[in-house]
């Protein structure tokens, strides 16, 4: 069964554990997801079954929108509601001051990923090292903050909605935000509400061609796609280099054009 949909991962489950529940629910062993959510986080997780598990790299998954609660005055090794080492009662901040920092932290931001993250260090996940008390040497990264707004402030909890690029860490944003205030802070909750155009809709099966980040191309002899026959660039409507999808009534294929040569990236993927 080919299927792609937006699931809602609950808090307290790893993304892998949640995927296992979906495999059992839909009786489908070939399944995958994109965009790992930490166990303490909840929200939209893109899930695919069957041949559609090969399509993640072609999906438009950015920007991503989250709702987050920053717990001001708290020091956590993992920047979430676990591994808390210190809780301080700090003075309440002026809302205008908080808004000023929000405004400053727009655009491209440099950051270091959290020690408790899925980044790999010589094949080992950083969080596995962190659990053993080993500090990983994580390289600085960049994320783009497209928009951020304050939803509410009930000291010491600051609720925000933030839209960011793929690969961004909201925990790192929280750390940088707190640093500008001269305090520690951690996330007490995190929910992903949107990933690209994907929003939760009761696990409704989606038309994947509306969600892939590719332009359509066209060929007169559609039977070539059905048979996986060699395609020449002159047979296509568009000749510019790049990736495209071509569809028939029941199937679609993804091709690449480079140096006047056409290559199948995926062929004869059945529509759901």
From Swiss-Prot:
The active site is at residue 38. InterPro entries: PsdUridine_synth_cat_dom_sf, PsdUridine_synth_N, tRNA_psdUridine_synth_TruB. Signal peptide: none annotated. Keywords: Isomerase, tRNA processing. Disulfide bonds: none annotated. One of its GO terms (molecular function) is RNA binding. Responsible for synthesis of pseudouridine from uracil-55 in the psi GC loop of transfer RNAs. PANTHER family: PSEUDOURIDYLATE SYNTHASE TRUB1, TRNA-PSEUDOURIDINE SYNTHASE. Belongs to the pseudouridine synthase TruB family. Type 1 subfamily. This is tRNA pseudouridine synthase B. It comes from Campylobacter jejuni subsp. jejuni serotype O:23/36 (strain 81-176).
């Amino acid at each position: 069964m080919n299927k792609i949909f937006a699931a809602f991962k609950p808090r307290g489950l790893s993304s892998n554990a949640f995927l296992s529940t979906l495999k059992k629910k839909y009786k489908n062993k070939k399944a995958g997801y994109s965009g790992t959510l930490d166990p303490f986080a909840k929200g939209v997780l893109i899930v695919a079954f069957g041949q559609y598990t090969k399509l993640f790299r072609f999906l438009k998954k950015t920007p991503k929108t989250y709702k987050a609660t920053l717990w001001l005055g708290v020091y956590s090794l993992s920047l979430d509601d676990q591994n808390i080492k210190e809780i301080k009662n700090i003075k309440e901040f002026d809302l205008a001051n908080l808004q000023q920092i929000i405004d400053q932290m727009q655009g491209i931001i440099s950051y270091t990923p959290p020690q408790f993250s899925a980044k790999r260090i010589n094949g080992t996940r950083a969080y596995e090292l962190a659990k053993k008390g080993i500090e990983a040497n994580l390289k600085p990264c960049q994320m783009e903050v497209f928009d951020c707004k304050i939803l509410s402030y009930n000291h010491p909890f600051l609720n925000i909605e933030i839209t960011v690029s793929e690969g961004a860490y909201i925990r790192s944003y929280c750390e940088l935000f707190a640093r500008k205030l001269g305090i520690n802070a951690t996330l007490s909750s995190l929910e992903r509400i949107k990933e690209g155009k994907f929003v939760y809709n009761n696990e409704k099966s989606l038309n994947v061609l509306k969600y892939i980040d590719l332009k359509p191309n066209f060929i007169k002899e559609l039977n070539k796609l059905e048979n996986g026959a060699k395609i020449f660039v002159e047979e296509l409507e568009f000749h510019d280099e790049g990736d495209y999808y071509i569809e028939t009534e029941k199937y679609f294929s993804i091709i690449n054009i480079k140096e006047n040569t056409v290559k199948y990236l995926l062929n004869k993927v059945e529509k759901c």
